[in-house]
Amino acid sequence: MGLQPGVLLVGLLLLGQGITQIHTSSGKSTLEGQLWPETKKNFPFSCSPKKLGLNMPSESVHTLTPADIKLIAAIGDMETPPDSGAVNLDTSERTEKEPWRGCMGMMTVLSDIISHFNPSVLLPTCPPWRSAAVRGGVEELRTQAEELVSSLKKNPQLDFQQDWKLINVFFSNASLCYLCPSAHENGPLMSNMDKLAGILHYLHQEVPRAFVNLVDLFEVVAMPRWHQGTMLSRPSPEACGCSGETSKLDTVVMQWSYQETWDSLLASSSFNDQESFAVVFQPFFYEVSSPVEEPPSQDPTTLALSLWNNMMKPVGQKDEPFSTIERRPMKCPSQESPYLFTYRNSNYQSRLLKRQRQHKEREGTEIRCPDKDPSDSTPTSVHRLKPADIKVIGALGDSLTAGNGAGSRPGNILDVLTEYRGLSWSIGADHNISSVTTLPNILREFNPSLKGFSTGTGKANSVGAFFNQAVAGARAGDLIPQARTLVDLMKNHTSINFEEDWKIITVFIGGNDLCDFCSDPVTNSPENFTDNIRQALDILHAEVPRAFVNMVKVLQIVNLRELYKDSRVSCPRLILRNLCRCVLLPDDNSTELESLIDINKKYQERTHQLIESGRYDTREDFTVVLQPFFEKVDIPKTSEGLPDNTSFAPDCFHFSSKTHARAASALWKNMLEPVGQKTTQNNFENSIDIICPNQAFPYLSTYKNGIEGHGTWLTCRERTPSASPPTSVHALRPADVRVVAALGDSLTAGSGIGSKPGDLADVITQYRGLSYSSGGDGSLMNVTTLPNILREFNSNLTGYAVGTGDASNTNAFLNQAVPGAKAEELMSQVKTLVQKMKDDPRINFHEDWKVITVLIGTNDLCNHCTDLDLYSSANFFNHLLNALDILHREVPRALVNLVDFMNPSIMRQVFLGNPDKCPVQQASILCNCVLSLRENSYELARMDALTRAYQSSMRELVESGRYDTREDFSVVLQPFFLNIRLPILEDGRPDTSFFAPDCINPGQKFHSQLSRALWVNMLEPVGSKTDTLDLTADISLPCPTQEEPFLRTPQNSDYTYPTKPAIENWGSDFLCTEWKPSNSVPTSVHKLQPADIKVVAALGDSLTTAVGARASNSSDLLMSWRGLSWSIGGDGALETHTTLPNILKKFNPSIFGFSTGTLEETAGFNVAVEEARARDMPAQARDLVERMKASTEINLEMDWKLITLFIGSNDLCHYCDNPENHSAEEYVQHIRQALDILYEELPRAFINVVDIIMELAGLHQGQGGHCTALLPAQSTCSCLRHFPSSPVIQELKKVTWNLQSDMSRLSYQEKYTQREDFAVVVQPFFQNTLIPLDKLGSTDPTFFSEDCLHFSERGHAEMAIALWNNMLEPVGHKTTFNNFTYNRTKLKCPSTESPYLYTLQNSLSLPVQTEKASGVAPGIVSAAAAGGLLVGLIVGILAVSLWSSFRRRQKKSPPESVPVANF
């Protein structure tokens, strides 16, 4: 098909009918100044010649720079009109002088450019003007060459031998026959071509030091005239010997080939070997697009600039078409390549020679399907159509279906014009499946008598095309005549029975529509695109009986840019940009590119809507199925990460035979995949296995037969078990699994899965056969469950449940889940399961491999608020541990899936978001502790925290390695349930169709997705498992591979359990930006900003002196680390130590009064005493006043002071010694006395009173003896000796509640609101604070000191953060709890709107009081009461925790008998 090197120039008829004669004017060789007065100002000169640093003139033409050029000259013909700046001459004179003026205009611009590099460049030279009567052809060009040589030799300003000359030889190929792909290789032009070559040889012999541009201006000169009715006209294809109409593809390929032929000729000529002479072909081609408008004439300035830009590009990269619209910016020589480019310094290699490389073998395959038989009788329904029933095949489309370039050898770009229809993916049938993979060759394996496929090469009307009616360059509108032609051919062909034979017709279109979209957005709109497809499909639907039509979705074409833009890949970019300019030319991130991507998606979406509208499913013997395998196509990559151009034809646009083969495999796979589960993404880097029809359901998939109900398609070819039963769980294949079992609650039991919408009463029915992890109803084709997936690998699987019934029903088999079950009941389920497996004769207990799925936790959360202790995360952890321990101890050969439970927030969203569909009136019965909580409430936050603790405890248990001690047992956490994406309806409400009628239990759609997600997780490596489930996603079932054939465990995933990095300090990051103090020192405490505070102080007990904040060197004595104290410590800076003073230092670095170190001398205004009780507060207040009055560092009257009072731990600890002598009234009275002293003695003071807490002893819970000072703690805190149910502890709860109630009133005491410069604010963050827990759900010891009664530095940091944040919250709206989660950015900032510390007055919350004496807001008392109840419960935790610790020391029990604390 290609040209031989010896006939490169001749073979393409390069010069048309001759060299156009030149118009000249006598003797003129200089420019008339008035013709182009604005030449230089037409474009900015952006180059910097000085930066090139070139001084010495070049000795070689291959290192010739613009600065070396002394003279610019031209010979040849230019019939280009002057630009708008030209003077108005007489029409006839202008016509005669146009060529000469065009030449002088162009050369002047070039001279102007060169003058910036070499100011001494001479005036340009053009051939003398002669009248039209004496125009010749090549002879005239020879005459001009001789005259030029003569004038150069006579020019006194030019050193003819030493000066470098730039000579431009213009010619015009007056015929477009070179655009004809089948142009004659011999003709009358040979002599003219030889003469042109003779002219170049003449210049080479006569002119030393010359760089010659060979420029064909035919398209620039002639193309506008095709539209003007002049003597020049486009030659007809017949006149050139073309076989038919010249297409856009023909045009762009032949343009490229024309240019490449010139380059190859010149590169291989003797010119390229010279040091003082070079000839370079400079192309001028228009962009090839739809002829919608007349191409505008080009002024000489634009032509000269385009020529200059071409000279600045290496040969082989001159791929920018001549623009008819915009003037492109001028290019500059680079420092790396400052010279004019020749063939030698461009390292040019002809692509016409590269094509001779060895052609890669075509890609075949093998089909090993067990069932290749047709239906027993010819089917009458398209929905029961087997592959072997197909007798006829056809196709419609464009060049990708016509097979352009599919068989071309690498580099043979000209051969892309050949249509290799026999290799076409959807319709070709060259050879057979072993060497050529196409859809017909696949189908011929099922029915060797298939008809209609194309073979060999040729156009759509060739004999070999048969029913392949695709046409290169076709768009969607061309499908209509193609469909008409195909129908006529089928009706009239005698080898087929038009009425009886089953037909497959594949339609694929859209690439050309997208490539030309920007040229004509209206014609190529998505609406017109799909309307044209509709009309074509309507013809098939109306006239073709017994047809299955593949409508292949248009490909994602934007990825072609990746191939085009990667300069490391050799591609003919001139061809690419001409074929698909709308895709390749827009800038990255441009609106044009975004528009294209959007249109591409709309093409796909509207096609999808058309096919799925049901328009073509009105007859039993006809259907159209959308095949989306091209929807998301990535460019194939090489092993080096480069775009793989072996996947493409030599033009880098069409498919190679390899990609045709992979497209065929992908189409076949799509045809067998269920609708809704079809593969949509491919990259074609690797071959695609030919899958077989499912033996249970062997039909081509349609919208009506596609997987029925809730089935799934499994495409795995490798389904064999291990050669011998594995002994290691880490080498377990799916086909090795013999037994499935499940444990859990109503979700696993299947409650309500099959219930009809609205049938709430039926939710109690346990549809175990549909359960995601253990159901075995139906088959995978209509019911997706884990057992049904595993049965595809091992048909002898057992253990799964069928039908309905409770756990004791024989249908349940090894599904021992019980509705309503909580974690504490899991151990009982395990024992029952183990016994059933041991007793059942169908199970070889010791030899059979088992998969056991465990899911529990939802019911614990539904009941957690009824007993916080019983449903604590620690107990959840222990129950789970006990159950798994039994499995680990008792069950051989088992893989246990531990599945995360459904987050209760999902339940709330669905249930509360659909009050008209969900039984909201039964919320308290169904799941009270989840569904009845108020939004943004403390209780809801507590539930969320407990949920996270449950999840963390599961992860911690598995990652402890406890169950990795045996080779035949493993527990794997499958986290797909961790994050659920709910389907949301258009009205914004969650879609209840995924749930049972109670809106709590999942329905069958939900269970189907759970099964798929579980299977995906089981094949994903540990550490890389999907932890998100989108309920609306198309989840395909992955397959084990030869490289990774096993169910994944930590060991075969090479996974190492993570270790948490140590935290270096407990500092905080300060993100506040408004640090300035008030413009003037405020006189009102209600206008007090943090930066106004000058002094800090504190009163309290050992929690304020920071006893035990750091580990002590002495085993007998805990040290007071006052510098780390939460409310008064000032050691270091905030970045390493979070304390209230260190926060305030960020606002005022000169703040005074804070403690440092451990000594009394550096305590500052920290007057707290370790053993202090409330009764000691007045004394501490007096001590503080005296210290302040005595200090010379502060101005007592003017400085603003922040004082924090926190007391009560010792009072409550000693309450049990003598309950009668401890009352809430007495406690508050002492506090009030201290506040009175401060009120009377200290001006300008803001007093924080922190609510009491008694939860510290809860640290003993679950610590297994962590606390080293248990007995001393009891002696220090006598209440720890009592049982939680004892009367004294019950009384302590009441006292605690009373204390907090009375304390909350202090902010509202009328006395403390009388002064403008004094305020008392109760900070309640401790009111509802929960014990900080670790990941296992046990009390986190890092918050506490060695004696377990005081805070560590981490605990002090959390208290400081909570106190600071309380200070920035309005009274009545303060946070009453602290969740102790670590975060360096938890500190709040004052806002521009509210820059002050909050007091009662500036909180705008002073209530209307009916009783002045009380001074208490009723709402606040109520809130305090609620908070006090919880704190009372925490007091109970204190005692029970210690009692549990005693029990553990007295009796070490096995894990399943760990005592449960009953709070």
From Swiss-Prot:
Keywords associated with the record: Cell membrane, Glycoprotein, Hydrolase, Lipid metabolism, Membrane, Phospholipid metabolism, Repeat, Signal, Transmembrane, Transmembrane helix
Subcellular location: Apical cell membrane
Signal peptide as annotated in the record: 1-24
Region Necessary for membrane localization, residue ranges: 1404-1450
Catalyzed chemical reaction(s): a 1,2-diacyl-sn-glycero-3-phosphocholine + H2O = a 1-acyl-sn-glycero-3-phosphocholine + a fatty acid + H(+); a 1-O-alkyl-2-acyl-sn-glycero-3-phosphocholine + H2O = a 1-O-alkyl-sn-glycero-3-phosphocholine + a fatty acid + H(+); a 1-acyl-sn-glycero-3-phosphocholine + H2O = sn-glycerol 3-phosphocholine + a fatty acid + H(+); a triacylglycerol + H2O = a diacylglycerol + a fatty acid + H(+)
Skewed-composition ranges (Basic and acidic residues): 360-375
Keyword ATP-binding applies: no
Any single Pfam family the record assigns to this protein: Lipase_GDSL
InterPro entries referenced in this protein's UniProt entry, alphabetically: GDSL (IPR001087), Lipase_GDSL_AS (IPR008265), Phospholipase_B (IPR035547), PLB1 (IPR038885), SGNH_hydro_sf (IPR036514)
Annotated segments matching region Disordered: 356-384
A GO term for molecular function: retinyl-palmitate esterase activity
Glycosylation sites noted in the Swiss-Prot or TrEMBL record: N173, N432, N492, N528, N589, N645, N782, N796, N1113, N1221, N1379, N1383
Post-translational modification comment from the UniProt entry: Undergoes proteolytic cleavage in the ileum.
Transmembrane segments: 1420-1440
SUPFAM superfamilies: SGNH hydrolase
Similarity-based family: Belongs to the 'GDSL' lipolytic enzyme family. Phospholipase B1 subfamily.
Full protein name: Phospholipase B1, membrane-associated
Organism of derivation: Cavia porcellus (Guinea pig)
Lineage: Eukaryota, Metazoa, Chordata, Craniata, Vertebrata
Name of the gene this protein is made from: PLB1
